[in-house]
Each structure stands twice: as C-alpha cells, then as structure tokens.
Amino acid sequence: MYREYIQKTIDLLREATGLEDVMITDGGDHADLASTVSFALAKTQRKNPAVIAGELVAVLSAKPEAKGIEISAKGPYINFIFGGDYVAESVHAARREDYGTLPARTDKVIIEHTSANPNGPLHVGHIRNTVIGDTLVRAFRKAGYPVEAQYYLNDMGRQIAIVAWGVQNLHYDRIPGEKGDEYIVRHYVEANKIAKAKPEIEPEFDLLMEKIEAGDPETVKLFHDSVDICADGIKETLSSMNVVHDKFVRETTFLWNGSMQDVLNRIEKLPIVHHEGQMMYLDLSDEGFGNRYVLRRSNGTSVYAARDLAFHLWKNAQCDRSIDVLGADHKLIGAQLQTTLKLIGERPPEIVHFEFVSLPEGSMTTRGGVFITADELIAETKKRAMEEVTVRRPELGEDEREKIAKAVAVGAVRYDIVKVSAEKSTVFDWKEALDFERQSAPYIQYAHARACSIMEKAKAEGGFAECYEYSDPYELALAKHIARFPYVLEKVVCELRPHLLATYVRDLADLFNSFYRFAPVLKAEGNVRDARLTLVDACRNTLYQALGVLGIEALESM
C-alpha cells in the first residue's frame, strides 16, 4: 500500500501546486512522507516557505482524495501521516502468500554474474559477485520481470590454455570425493609452477591458444572437457549457496559462429580504428581512456574484449535490459566495453561494480595456489553455526541441528556480504555474521522463527479472529514498515542496490522484536490479541518473502 499512497500524495500535491516535482521525501520519525515543495514555491510567490506550507495544508486537507491522510505543517515542511485504513489494508495485504510480488512486466532482463574463470574453485573474492548477482535475479523476478541468469564461461583464454596443458601433460588421477574444480586447480597451479621454473614451455600455451582459435578438434575437446569438469564443481558450490544459473554461455560460441568477426567488421568502419600488422585496436583517448583498446593480437588471434563485445550484442538481441555484475578491478574494461558498443550504435549493459570482500586471515589468489575457497568458508561457517545451535538447542537431534546449522551458515555468508553497499569494500567477520543477538542473518531468521512459534501457540490455544485495529505505537511502527516491502523491492531493481533490502529486513526484525517485547501478544485479550496475532502473521510472511529474495532460508524453528 505504501507505493499507492506515495502516488496518491504526489497527485494531491501536483494538483495543488501545478508542479511536476513536488519534492517528496521520507518522513522519518515524524511522518510517513514529507514534502519540501514550499521552498520551490517561495521563489515564485515571494513568500515565507512556512506560510506557503500552512496554506497548502489547508488546501490539501479539504480534498476528498486526502481522506484518511493526516496533513500538517511543521515550519516549511508538509508532513503526511497515513491513517487507520492504510494500516489495516497494509496488514491485510501482507498476509497474502504472494505479498511483495509486483505486477508482471514484459521487459526481459538478463543478469550475468559470477562468471569466474573455470580454472579452480570459487574463492571468497568471487562470491560477493555471486551473492549480489543472485539477489538481483531474485529481486527482479519478485518484481514481475522475466529474468535469465547467465554465467559467461571462459573456455579459451590463456588461463584455460594453462589448465589444458596441465591436463594434457600431468595426468593426475582424480582423488575419490574430489570436486571437479578442486581436481582442475591442481593442474593449473602445478602448470604455473612449472612455467615459472621453465619459461621455455610458455610457447606451448600460445600454441594451444592458436589451435583452439582455429577450431582444432582435438584441442577443442581438451579445452571443453577440462572446462566442463571445473564448471561442474563450481555449480556444486553455487548450489550450496542457493544459487542457480539459467544458462552457461561458452565464450568460444562467438568466435566460431562468426558473430565476433561481424562486430569487428563494424568496428573497422570507425575512424578511430588502427592496425599494426595483424594487430587491431581502437584509439579511445578522446573518450577518456588510454589510446589502445586491443581487439586482435599481432599474431592474428582474437582477444577476450572482441568476444565480449559479440556476447553483449547477442544478449541485446534477447533482452530489453542487460546487467553485468563486475568487480572494481573491471571498471576500465567495463567502461571500454560500454563506450565501444555506443560507438557502433548499440545499447551498452548496465554494470554493477563491487569492491571486494576479504577475510582477516590472508589473501586469495588462484594462480599461486594460496586461497580460501567458498566451500571452505561455508564449511567453517557451518561448523561455527553448529556449535552455536548445539549450545542453544541441545535437545534437538543431530540431523535437525545440522539442517539448522547449514541454513544459518549460508544465510550468514549471504547476508554479511549483501548488507554492505556494493561500492564499499567489506571484511567477512564470522563472529558478527553468526551473532544471534545482533543485526545478522541468524538474528533475522530467529525473528521469523519466533513469529512462527507465536502463531503455533495461538493455533494450539484455539486460533484467533482477523482484526486490523491498531493504535499502540509499536503496532503502528511495525505495520507501517511491513507496508514498505513492495516499495523497497521496486527501489532495489530500479537502482540495482540489493543492500537496501538487507537493511529493510534487518529493520523489520528490529521492529518486530521491539513489538514482541513491549506489546504482549498471547497474553493480550479480545480484539487486541486478535489484532496483534494478525500483525504477527503479516510480519512472519513479510520476513519469509524478504528472506526469500535474499536467498536465505526462513527457518520455522531455531
């Protein structure tokens, strides 16, 4: 209902002022909405903004459309407080199974995320990409968009040539129980060590790259088999984090289907294209970049950038909105891609850049073989969660404690990563992420479990009758925050800022816990008891829906 009442307020102000921008802001602790439009009117009317605000309040309050909205002036500010009907309608709506789901849209969205090179396991540095991307996918789906999640699979670059050389020459046996990505990274790390000790083997990597580009069948099979083994392991890791991609798209596709050459032919017509022998590059210095954006090497082989351009043209043909999630170290590459697509008259992707997540312990690098994998992070978090669950619920069987610990661990990792704005770096802290008493995923999951427990107890006591009458400040604060969920979801997809939802659901858990503490539910009587149980049910469902968008399991018992 919050979105609808925002629009109603905007319409009232536009009609009263004749202005398009009526300067609506959040009302903070004093109101549901506020407007500073009196400042804009003061410039033309040559009046004190506070006087204008008072006059507008009189005009607005007299309108039939303002029924149920308390409108007042505080100095130059106009405050809007939504009344009992709004609260009742909001709580009623929040009890629907599909609460928060927005009307179906027709614009298709493709979100590419994770896309780590298949030369080893995902590490902690990769999974911020994964969590941000998957949360956006879930948010767009909840917001009514047809969405496809894609993973761009590098199956021909230099790093993959090193993997292929390792598989071809080292002949390691697969250890029982070893994941595919773990198996492949052993070849990759050892091949790099050998190359460092014996630089004379470097031309063998170059030869493999030339063969894959030429489509040599034996080399193609070697590369694809190696990549597929690693990708299977990566998919297992993603699945353990509640992440599924709709499509894995091979980079070689755009080399062999002619689309890369097609885009290079179009670029050839630009006046800023240059050649040195077989090398081809764009001079993007007038666009604010370095003067060489290389698209073909001196030996005639293509580079990643050329294939990436073809990939984005292919995506554009299938969607109305293309979104890439990339690390901050890809800002230059991303900007060059966007600029080049604009130069040939094509739509550039929207890019969500993120700073990196790290651990207090050490660095992460695949090439050197020193890294903390996503699997290790989740396993360690699960181990620590199991210890906490065992202390809190020793009466539960081990299987039940394992189930809770896994959900808590995945939730802790996902939430601790997504709660921070993408443009800010963050350090994953186990103690903070697993704190049941503070603003973490377990804290929010526990709020949901508490709401479920209250509803179960009410059912055992004979149930309750729906009631939507609220006056207590803790009731009203909780109900009005519940009403904002669809609005926050819309804001996430418009601004591509998933941390907004993480903040919203944390605040919802806070408000619910305050309500639980200061507004007794099961011990209340009559309509008060019924109304509070109705509100608990609405909060339970809102927590469930919001946690679902965050990819976190809403536990019914903890």
Curated annotation (Swiss-Prot):
| Entry protein name | Arginine--tRNA ligase
GO BP field:
arginyl-tRNA aminoacylation
HAMAP family for this protein: Arg_tRNA_synth
Q: What intrachain disulfides are recorded?
A: none
Record-listed E.C. numbers:
6.1.1.19
Just give the chief location class: cytoplasm
What Pfam families does the record point to? Arg_tRNA_synt_N (PF03485), DALR_1 (PF05746), tRNA-synt_1d (PF00750)
Q: Does the keyword Nucleotide-binding apply?
A: yes
Q: Which UniProt keywords apply?
A: Aminoacyl-tRNA synthetase, ATP-binding, Cytoplasm, Ligase, Nucleotide-binding, Protein biosynthesis
- Where in the cell does this protein reside? Cytoplasm
Q: Which reaction does it catalyse?
A: tRNA(Arg) + L-arginine + ATP = L-arginyl-tRNA(Arg) + AMP + diphosphate
Any one cellular-component term (Gene Ontology): cytoplasm
GO function terms (MF aspect):
arginine-tRNA ligase activity; ATP binding
Which SUPFAM superfamilies does the record match to this protein? Anticodon-binding domain of a subclass of class I aminoacyl-tRNA synthetases, Arginyl-tRNA synthetase (ArgRS), N-terminal 'additional' domain, Nucleotidylyl transferase
Residue ranges annotated as motif 'HIGH' region:
116-126
Family assignment from sequence similarity: Belongs to the class-I aminoacyl-tRNA synthetase family.
Primary enzyme class: ligase
